[in-house]
């Protein structure tokens, strides 16, 4: 397993434990290690959404979407688009329930 994958797994584990700030730190390291890999941006965006930091989440989604042009990143692009919509919808509202999903809602490319 690559260092990138180990760091991603650590971040995902922290996320699942509800340690979103710590997960953000792990995902920052992913972005630093591979700035053109959209996975770090996508994962960080979801952790930021959980923290209620919607503006930063929007920025992460927008940055990540710059790097989703390859076929292998189609699923990540869909996640980024979904998370961008979640964060944009939350900006200005009091609070909306946000849940992580293993399956994307209808209308999002699942490839």
Curated annotation (Swiss-Prot):
TPR repeat windows: 4-37, 39-71
Stored PROSITE patterns: TPR_REGION
One GO cellular component term noted in the UniProt record for this chain: R2TP complex
Organism, scientific name: Saccharomyces cerevisiae (strain ATCC 204508 / S288c)
SMART domains per the UniProt record, alphabetical: TPR
InterPro entries listed in its UniProt record: RPAP3, TPR-like_helical_dom_sf, TPR_rpt
Quaternary structure note: Component of the R2TP complex composed at least of RVB1, RVB2, TAH1 and PIH1. Also interacts with HSP90.
GO MF entries: protein-folding chaperone binding
Keywords associated with the record: Acetylation, Cytoplasm, Nucleus, Repeat, TPR repeat
Official protein name in the record: TPR repeat-containing protein associated with Hsp90
A GO BP annotation: protein folding
Miscellaneous comment as given in the Swiss-Prot or TrEMBL entry: Present with 1660 molecules/cell in log phase SD medium.
Domain of life: Eukaryota
Residues with N-acetylserine modification: 2
Compartment(s) where it occurs, according to its Swiss-Prot or TrEMBL record: Cytoplasm; Nucleus
Keyword match Lyase: no
UniProt KW NADP keyword: no
């Amino acid at each position: 397993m690559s260092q990138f994958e180990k760091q991603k797994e650590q971040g995902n584990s922290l996320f699942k434990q509800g340690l979103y700030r710590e997960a953000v730190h792990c995902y920052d390291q992913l972005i630093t290690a591979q700035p053109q890999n959209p996975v770090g941006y996508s994962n960080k965006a979801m952790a930021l959404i959980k923290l209620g930091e919607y503006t930063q989440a929007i920025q992460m989604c927008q940055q990540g979407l710059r790097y989703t042009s390859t076929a292998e990143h189609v699923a990540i692009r869909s996640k980024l688009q979904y998370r961008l919509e979640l964060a944009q919808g939350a900006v200005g509202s009091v609070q909306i329930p946000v849940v992580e999903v293993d399956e994307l809602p209808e209308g999002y490319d699942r490839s």
